Amino acid sequence: METLELQGAKLRYHQVGQGPVLIFIPGANGTGNIFLPLAEQLKDHFTVVAVDRRDYGESELTEPLPDSASNPDSDYRVKRDAQDIAELAKSLSDEPVYILGSSSGSIVAMHVLKDYPEVVKKIAFHEPPINTFLPDSTYWKDKNDDIVHQILTEGLEKGMKTFGETLNIAPIDAKMMSQPADTEEGRIEQYKRTMFWSEFEIRQYTHSDITLDDFTKYSDKITLLNGTDSRGSFPQDVNFYINKETGIPIVDIPGGHLGYIQKPEGFADVLLNMWG
């Protein structure tokens, strides 16, 4: 893996291929290796970069998180993630780059576009679970508060079951999300990673400071992506609302919420049709 030294962290990332830079931002998994099957499909067309977000995988913190980062209203980590992606983009290319964020990674991508638009050539938001600008934002914020409380008091299994039911996660995705790692060490790491995401991201990222105006001023750069196998899920409803209010197009893409793993060939074909 490659390394970029940043304030407070060593950011690690996979890099394959040639051509214009395309950065993938992972969601709850946090690690870029989930994009490697997709990267193989795109490496003849793009320099594909798949990031381990700070606090995840091979990326290392060199300074501790501030205590305030676990506050439900803290924007520290999502803003830090966005700054990391912008600094990575600048280190890799003198030109604006392509960016795709998936799930909570798409919320990071929104903050990249909002705060660092100069690094963005084109950007895609794949099924973002953000609620800040929705008419029923308070309802969804309260639901996420309840989910995190349940995880912290009743355990991860019960909380994630509620999470899946509340967001209407498709069966194809629920099955993959609940699949345990192959080794005991892997299962321990998986548990720690999911607990970290629960405490530091479910509430903070989904209710972070993004408005519809943040999209309209850059609408020519944005594509919304909804999976063909995750119809009816909350993240898709978010994209439908953005589309209705701004006119930014939605493109159907193969697979579900984890479509880049489930159907990497078809996922890549859509990206090449968009950006190739």
UniProtKB/Swiss-Prot annotation:
Record-given protein name? Uncharacterized hydrolase SA2367
Disordered: annotated segments: 57-76
Q: Which residues form the AB hydrolase-1 domain?
A: 20-137
Keywords for the protein's UniProt record, in alphabetical order:
Hydrolase
Q: Name one GO molecular function term.
A: hydrolase activity
One Pfam family from the UniProt entry? Answer: Abhydrolase_1
* Origin: domain of life: Bacteria
Its top-level enzyme class, in one word, is hydrolase
Q: Which organism is it from?
A: Staphylococcus aureus (strain N315)
